Structures are given as C-alpha cells and as structure tokens.
Amino acid sequence: PYGHVVAESVEGINTVNGHSYSDPALQSENTNFALLVSNRFTQPFNEPYRYGKHIASLSNMLAGGVLVQRFGDLVSGIRTNEHRMSKSFVRPTLTAAVPGDLSLALPKRQLDDIIEMIYQLDKIAPGTANYDTLLYGAEVKFYSARLALSGELETSLPGFFAVGDGAG
C-alpha cells in the first residue's frame, strides 16, 4: 500500500524499483509490487548479466527511459499513449515514465509469465488485473554480482573483507 515507483540506474540504464512509505505525507493511493521473472539458462549460454542489461536497455531505447503501460492495453496489443494514460483512473507515481508498449521491450516468455501472474493474483486480490493497472519496465535484479576478492576474502579496499553472495 501507499506505493511509489522510483527510477534507478544500473550502469547507466534507467530501471525501476518500488517503495512504500509509512509517513502519510509521502503516501500515494497506489499499491506497488514487483513481478520478477527468473531465467535459468543452460549451456552454452553464459551471459545472464549482459542479457538482463540488454532487456533493460530496450525500454530505454524505446522511451528514452522507463516505459509505463496499462495492463488492459498490453493484453489488447495496444500501445499506451499519452491520451490513453490520461483516461486512466490510476495515476503513475513515476511521472518521468513514458507511455509505451512493453511487448517491444520484454521477451514473450517473460511477458506471458507476468500476464499470467497478474490474472492469478486477481483471483485472490480482485482488481489486480484491472485495465488501468500500470506496469513499468523494466525492473531488473542481478543476483550474480561477484566481488573481486583475495584468497583471504579481502576486497580491493585494504582491510575490508566480504562474505556471502553479495546480493544483499
């Protein structure tokens, strides 16, 4: 509840993330949540990080930044434009997002998974699959980041050691 979509930058690529605020002065009327689709690649492919960056960069190429699309337009195969967005009862919290067509930026398999999940969520949270539900893209998470460590787990910062997978 009270969600906001915010811009992030991943190595110069504009992506999105979400926040909810307990401070009433910062709250919105929207609920924000992320639907992330994971990929498990098989050999010979071994560049998941580059693949994710490429997907994120497609929305930047199409919109000059983050794309936003109404769910109903997406499933109808219609590009959301400024006129359609102005008719939406859900107002975007990331006003810099550009109305567009996420199907041009996200691979079909991932898009199908997101659409299916929204329909399933609608069964337990009616209204999730509303025509005016807003989808932003792209949000990417990289869980394969690797730190350069010495044999003693020391980073390039002298006296600074790291353990774990680095995702948190």
Which residue stretches match the model-derived regions?
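Residues forming the flavin
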Residues: 1-168
